[in-house]
Structure formats: C-alpha cells, structure tokens
Amino acid sequence: MEKKQIINISIIIPVYKVEAYIERCIKSVATQEGIGSAYNLECILVDDCTPDRSMEIAKETIKQYENIHFICLRHEVNRGCSVARNTGLEYATGEYIMFIDSDDYVLPNCLKSFTDEIIKDPAIDMVIGSTIINNKTDIKERELLKGKESIIHGFLTMKYLITSWNKLVRKECITENKLLFIENIYLQDQPWLYYLASHIDSMLLLPNTTYSYEEAPESASHGVLNPEKAQRYVNSWNTVFEYYLSHRPNSKDFKHNLETDFLLYLQRTHLRAIMLFPYEKKDYNRILRFRDKIMSLALKDGRLIIACFLLLEYKPFIYLFKFKFIRSHYYYMVKTVGRIAHLFDFVHRKN
C-alpha cells in the first residue's frame, strides 16, 4: 500500500499589542482539521517586543496543545511586522509557509483545503483561499493560474487580495529568490507579493472561505493618524511606488502586453494613496509626484486611453470622487478602460 504523503507546514505569526486577539488566533491554528494526518504543523510566534500581555497569553494557550510544534522567538527591540516575518522565515522548517496576522484567525478547514489541493497537484506553488472581510468573501470561483504572465496579470487586476496572509506558499519560492519583506514601511505586503508573483509558475485560487480578516479600529483606513504616522505612510507609499516602477513587467517576455494592466494598477493604487486620509500639503505633493510619473509612462508608451483615464487624478476631475456613485463604480470603470486599452494593444500588435 502506497504511503500517504504528509506535507510539512510552518505558520508564522508576528505578535505585538494583540492581547485581546492572540488566544483566538492560536486556537484557530491549533484546532485545524487534518493536523498529523494530512500535514504536520509548526507554528512560529515572533514576539516583536510587545509591551502588553500578548505573549503571556500566547504561552498559556499553547500549553493546551501537543499536536503542534510551537516556537516562540523574541526581538530585543520593536522592529515591525516585516522584520518579525523575516525572523520567522529564518527558523521555519516546513516545505510550505503561511503568514497569519495575530488579530485575525483561520477557519477550521483552512490548511486541509490547501494541502488537499497540493497533494492532488504538487506543481502548485501557492494556494489562496477566500477571505471574510466585512461579512463578504473575495474569491467566488476556483481558478488555476499557470505561468508568470497569468499570475502577474492576476496580481495587477486584483483577482486576489494583495496581502501576505491566507496564502500557502512553497518555501523554496521564497528562499531561493531571497524574498524578504521590506523593513520600516507600512504596506509591506504589496512589493513582497508582487515579487513573489513574478517568481512562481502555478497558483490556485479557491472559493473555500479559509480566513477571517479583522480590521483594527486604529488602522489607516479609519483616518486616525498622528503626524509621525502620516509621514511614515508617505514614505511607505513612496517606497512602494519606486519598487513598482523599478520592477516593471517585461512585456517582451509574454504573449500579451502587461503594460496596460501595470499602469492601471499603479493608477488605482495611487488613487487610494491620495484619498485614504488627509495629508499635510508637503506630504500630499510628494505623493502627487508619482501621479505625474505614471502619466509620463503612459504618454511615453503611447497609451492615450490610459492617459485620458489618468486625468481623473488631476483637478478638477479628482473632485468627482466626492460623489458616492463614482467611488462605488470606479472598479467597473477600471475594468472597462482596461478592456478598451487592451483592444488597442491588440490592434497595434496586428499592425
């Protein structure tokens, strides 16, 4: 009788100021279906010098479970989520990696759903499940993306959430490409996932609901920012945009031109940056410089459809986003513009 394949998984959880949530998070991991039969599990908790009782609660909680190998690591000083994840990666022994934010939790079927798919198709480099956000889920149908072109296209068109969590990733894809999170910035998931998408060959999107995202009341989307945080967000956006601009997809490598998707993604990301919360004038102007860089790229490449759409970020058109109708239909506007722009790409290639 053929021996059943057992997959080894490492889960990495940064811990900082989450005493109200950490027990729930750990229990959701420890009570996963299939531990020991479908896969072996280690869980790495990285204490990022948390000042509250988070680690005390975590250590009490893990005593209840012997079916998982828990590793507790500690930073001597607070270094941020990026470094905590990088630290976890150093110690991870699993063939596959999953990141979980400590104020979130995974549903009971999460890891078994992922590993069942990998056992059926070992070529899959990453499995992504559907996430509950505000009582809604994001992935509606199963889809296997094969080849870098399809995977990068999926990123740029946001077929899946631009996050590091709720994704089971082959560890080799991370370590062989020296893929670490950028330190000292917010939004660190964006460049990390973009680079990862450029270095894997097979990705599976699952409609199975596997992860619950809990938005913290103090998060940026609620507009609660002191001057220091605002400055850090501006620096973070600048880092992210510079990263994207220096890692443009080489369209010569693909059958279809990804430049249209790339420019529309930049425009959508930039619009979110300038509308997320009010900045001081000097910070706002720093972010606007990237709007002009995106416009320059579009014009230089002769993408007039994209350039016209980018005018929405300039006065007086930017004021249209004060209307709820425009905001709620913006996603569909992007898709429509993308289709039209791709049609012109096709005509151009034919000629």
Q: Could you describe each region identified by the protein language model?
A:
Residues V18-E33:
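Short, well-formed alpha-helical segments that are part of the catalytic scaffolds
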Residues Y39-C49, I71-H75, S102:
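Short beta-strand/loop segment that forms part of the nucleotide-sugar
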Residues H75-A92, S113:
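Glycine-rich, basic loop-to-helix element that forms the pyrophosphate-binding segment
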Residues I7-S10, E42, P191:
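Cell-envelope/extracellular polymer assembly enzymes that use nucleotide-activated donors
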Residues S82, S102-L205, Y213-E228, P249:
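Donor-binding/catalytic cores of nucleotide-activated saccharide
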Residues S28, D47-E56, V77:
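A conserved acidic beta->alpha catalytic loop
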Residues M1, F277-N351:
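Membrane-interface aromatic/basic loop that binds lipid-linked glycans or pyrophosphate carriers
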Residues I97:
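Short aromatic/hydrophobic "clamp" motif used to bind/position activated sugar donors
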